[in-house]
Amino acid sequence: MTEKTASHYWNEETSILKLRRKDILLFEIYATTLLLGSIYSIYVDKWSITSYFGNSKNLINLIFVKRGWFWTSLVYFYHAWDQKRNKIDFKFISRYIVATLWWMFVTQWFIGPGLIDRTFALSGGSCKNFDGDSSVFIPLTASTCKGLNGSWSGGHDLSGHVFLLTHSSLFMLSENFSFILNNGIKATSTKVLFGLLGLWWWMLFVTASFYHTTFEKCTGFFSGILEWSIVYVFSSRMPAVADLLGSSDY
């Protein structure tokens, strides 16, 4: 299969909701990873975790995953500037801004607390046993609660790790899928991109194996594919979105 034929093959629509082969492939990779991790979690004693990666204080989690969108942005623009700088235009930047806004809305801020914290609170969760007078102030976010030595408990804890790792990976792969098919993994910047994708994949498997309930992982995954589905999968059926954001199929 030649490079052009490969690119054409993966961008062809299938009989499954007229989805392209590459979109089905990307969905299957991350859905399967989540499924395998969840199956593995059945055999893991979460109360006596000895695995290095099973400890949330491992350096990879603290240095990379906790700052996941920073590393995603850094590697994304490094690769784009090195390999596709002539393609960096308004629509290219617009797609990044949309992806960043979705990350921000889910994890950081959405007219107040982010959607993760809002979901937790709306499902009955709250900060308990924190340092302060509960009649004067009630922490509304997990980070504020933790900062006051409280316990953020009682609600639906949508998996932020599953969201971030899925969202970041699908964003980088969708932006570079055709480019990689046509150019391979020769350049240093492309190898760095694949290195980060590999790390994100591994940490997604770790998260699915050691943390959260099945439903919490599923809602995190749904949040992770939502923006991707609109911008990259179904945008061709939404003229307004397609006109504003263009296509990543370089």
Swiss-Prot record:
Domain of life: Eukaryota
Molecular functions per Gene Ontology: coenzyme A diphosphatase activity; hydrolase activity, acting on acid anhydrides, in phosphorus-containing anhydrides
Coiled coil: none
Record InterPro entries: FIT, SCS3
Short name of one Pfam family: FIT
Lumenal-side segments: 45-58, 117-160, 213
Membrane topology: Multi-pass membrane protein
Cytoplasmic side stretches: 1-23, 80-95, 182-191, 235-250
Keywords: Endoplasmic reticulum, Glycoprotein, Hydrolase, Lipid biosynthesis, Lipid metabolism, Membrane, Phospholipid biosynthesis, Phospholipid metabolism, Transmembrane, Transmembrane helix
Glycosylation-annotated residues: 149
Enzyme class: hydrolase
Record-stated family: Belongs to the FIT family. Fungal FIT2B/SCS3 subfamily.
Function text: Fatty acyl-coenzyme A (CoA) diphosphatase that hydrolyzes fatty acyl-CoA to yield acyl-4'-phosphopantetheine and adenosine 3',5'-bisphosphate. Preferentially hydrolyzes unsaturated long-chain acyl-CoA substrates in the endoplasmic reticulum (ER) lumen. This catalytic activity is required for maintaining ER structure and for lipid droplets (LDs) biogenesis, which are lipid storage organelles involved in maintaining lipid and energy homeostasis. May directly bind to diacylglycerol (DAGs) and triacylglycerol, which is also important for LD biogenesis.
Stated name of the protein: Acyl-coenzyme A diphosphatase fit1
Source species of the chain: Schizosaccharomyces pombe (strain 972 / ATCC 24843)
Lineage: Eukaryota, Fungi, Dikarya, Ascomycota, Taphrinomycotina
The gene coding this protein: fit1
